[in-house]
């Protein structure tokens, strides 16, 4: 019975009028709540697994540090990346290195505001002079993503010793030919 009246109202006003109805407002609030709950439940339950995906895919750390984080990156990389497997860095130190890079080395920073203030090692870009950090990569990371990478490195990489065939096959699949060069896990 209200359809002719609604059809006569211009679309913009009709949208505002519909949106302002208390029932519709409640529906919109419920939809927003469901979307929030869905987004939160989509957060990874295993931060190390999420960190591994970020390490290899989004941040592309493996390009320089290698798939096994042993410093054996891609041939086209700058070379000389740290062997993270031998690192002694603590979680907060790993986070700072990933966020801020390492001035004077090819290690980039993943914080888009790095060195604009003193958040990184207590210095600004101007204070670094010739030791300016490498240009930031095209991808920056959120703090939670950097934390997930650090969690992955601490759980699955740091202190693990030499790369094993099992680690290689976990990465490339059982029986991968390239994994034959690595020893079995002791």
Describe each region flagged by the PLM.
Residues 28-38:
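Bacterial N-terminal signal peptides
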Residues 7-15, 25, 36:
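Ala/Thr-enriched low-complexity intrinsically disordered regions
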Residues 18-29:
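Bacterial N-terminal signal peptides that target proteins for export
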């Amino acid at each position: 019975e209200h359809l002719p009246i609604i059809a006569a109202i211009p679309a913009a006003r009709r949208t505002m009028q519909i949106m302002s109805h208390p029932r519709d407002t409640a529906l919109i609030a419920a939809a927003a709540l469901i979307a929030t709950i869905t987004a939160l439940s989509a957060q990874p339950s295993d931060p190390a697994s999420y960190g591994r995906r970020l390490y290899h895919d989004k941040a592309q750390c493996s390009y320089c540090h290698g798939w096994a984080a042993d410093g054996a990156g891609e041939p086209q990389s700058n070379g000389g990346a740290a062997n993270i497997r031998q690192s002694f860095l603590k979680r907060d130190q790993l986070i700072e290195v990933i966020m801020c890079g390492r001035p004077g080395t090819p290690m980039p920073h993943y914080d888009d505001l790095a060195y604009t203030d003193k958040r990184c090692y207590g210095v600004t870009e101007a204070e670094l002079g010739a030791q300016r950090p490498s240009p930031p990569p095209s991808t920056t990371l959120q703090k939670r993503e950097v934390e997930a990478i650090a969690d992955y490195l601490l759980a699955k990489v740091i202190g693990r010793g030499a790369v094993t065939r099992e680690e290689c096959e976990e990465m490339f699949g059982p029986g991968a030919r390239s994994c034959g060069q690595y020893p079995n896990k002791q």
